[in-house]
A protein has these predicted regions:
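Transmembrane beta-barrel domains of Gram-negative outer membranes and organellar outer membranes
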Residues: 22-287
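Bacterial N-terminal signal peptides that target proteins for export
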Residues: 1-8
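N-terminal signal peptide c-region/cleavage motif recognized by signal peptidases
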Residues: 17-19
């Protein structure tokens, strides 16, 4: 059974792969909880986003993220390492405005594609939840410049971030899991030398476990520009709300969520679907 499930996950990753973790798909907001030491969490999904906007390239259109993937490794009872990103972005171009960077697109092109940027992060659980107090954690990492800015989708910049994680469970058997993030991201301004924008990152989320097989999940997640006006191109305020579900079956967790953009620089709406597999213990962490 284990080998067949692992094979299924491999097919999903190769066919649909690379939030976005002990992050709970379909949410972006990070949970405080850590996966067990020596285990690996594998996530794969697809996003369909309408009305995506790219202020640096001047493109707008409908974006398909094929392969929204995450690999999380439990290193100790309170430390987790994460790799996440997007294997390929496909943009159906609806309009083209002035571009702040040279684009390698034909004048009449109606589509573009590019690899997404990958993120490396470490999550540390600092305090376990008590009857009266929440659990606390810290997550920090770096976004790598894997995309090609000339394709008009990614920005090909190196960005750093860190956030405080808070979580509290309520109800019988802790069936309502609430958690939130508040942090800072240092975003390189892609069109200005020696310039950055320090944006505030935030997220508030909840997962309600209806029964052993079914949960309802929702969140609001985004970043807030701290500069006058809209901030440097490519670093504007963005936010979205997600509402969806998780379904557990055959050792996997399937998910689906609707997405609604909340700022002028965010996609209008969309959906995400995906699957998560938690392996048994596959290695013994160093002590």
């Amino acid at each position: 059974m284990l080998s067949s499930r692992a094979f299924l996950i491999t097919i999903l990753i190769l066919g649909t792969s690379f939030s976005i973790s002990a992050q709970q798909r379909p949410l972006i907001t990070e949970d405080v909880d850590i996966i067990p030491p020596g285990t690996i969490r594998i996530e794969a999904g697809i996003d369909f986003l309408q009305g995506a906007k790219y202020t640096v390239s001047g493109l707008t259109g409908d974006l398909t993220r094929v392969g929204v993937i995450g690999f999380n490794v439990g290193l100790s009872p309170n430390v987790e390492f994460q790799i996440e990103g997007v294997a390929q972005n496909f943009l159906s171009i609806n309009s083209r405005g002035p571009s702040a960077v040279p684009l390698s697109l034909d004048p009449g092109a109606n589509s573009a594609n590019d690899t997404g940027d990958f993120t490396l992060a470490t999550k540390i659980k600092l305090r376990a939840e008590t009857a009266r107090g929440p659990s606390l954690g810290f997550r920090f990492g770096v976004q790598l410049p894997n995309s090609n800015q000339s394709r008009g989708i990614g920005l090909n910049q190196t960005n750093a971030f860190g956030s405080i994680l808070v979580g509290k469970k309520f109800g019988r058997d802790g069936r309502l899991n609430t958690f939130g993030n508040l942090g800072l991201a240092i975003l390189t301004a892609p069109t200005a030398l020696f310039t950055q924008n320090d944006v505030i990152t935030y997220g508030v989320a909840g997962i309600f476990r209806v029964n052993k097989q079914f949960s309802i999940a929702g969140e609001v997640n985004g970043r807030a520009n701290t500069r006058p006006g809209d901030g440097p191109l490519g670093t504007e305020s963005q936010a979205e709300a997600r509402l969806g579900m998780q379904i557990r079956a055959s050792g996997l967790r399937f998910d689906f969520a609707g997405i609604k953009g909340l700022t002028n620089f965010t996609h209008n709406s969309g959906v995400t679907i995906g699957v998560t597999y938690d392996t048994p213990t596959v290695f013994a962490p160093a002590k």
